Amino acid sequence: EVKLEESGGGLVQPGGSMKLSCVASGFTFSNYWMNWVRQSPEKGLEWVAEIRLKSHNYATHYAESVKGRFTISRDDSKSSVYLRMNNLRPEDTGIYYCTTGFAYWGQGTLVTVSA
């Protein structure tokens, strides 16, 4: 059974930082590109970031709205993917999901950016 479990969300003030984690099980994690996606009432579902495989030198790609503020990383030995978020803005509020190429999704973790 494939499982993706996100954690690390919560309430943070504008300009603050937060790190999300996602632990995977039930598949060979190191063989899959991983993504972070977020959902909000205002913007709906929005792709955030992608990290590829070791064979691709762990190449990363980002949505324009988060470029320079968010950093995706992975640890294949822990079957985990991370999202470091800096200089958070109210518009970053949403439920953040990790996905394996959009085939499998976690339950999500809520990030609220508010004073």
UniProtKB/Swiss-Prot annotation:
A Pfam family the protein falls into: V-set
Gene Ontology process terms (BP): immunoglobulin mediated immune response
Disulfide bonds: C22-C98
A molecular-function term among this protein's GO annotations: antigen binding
Keywords recorded for this protein, A-Z: Adaptive immunity, Disulfide bond, Immunity, Immunoglobulin
Gene Ontology cellular-component terms listed: extracellular region; immunoglobulin complex
Region forming the signal peptide: none
SMART domains named among the record's database cross-references: IG, IGv
Domain of life the protein comes from: Eukaryota
Domain Ig-like: 1-114
Miscellaneous field: This chain was isolated from a myeloma protein that binds inulin.
Protein name, as recorded: Ig heavy chain V-III region W3082
Biological source species: Mus musculus (Mouse)
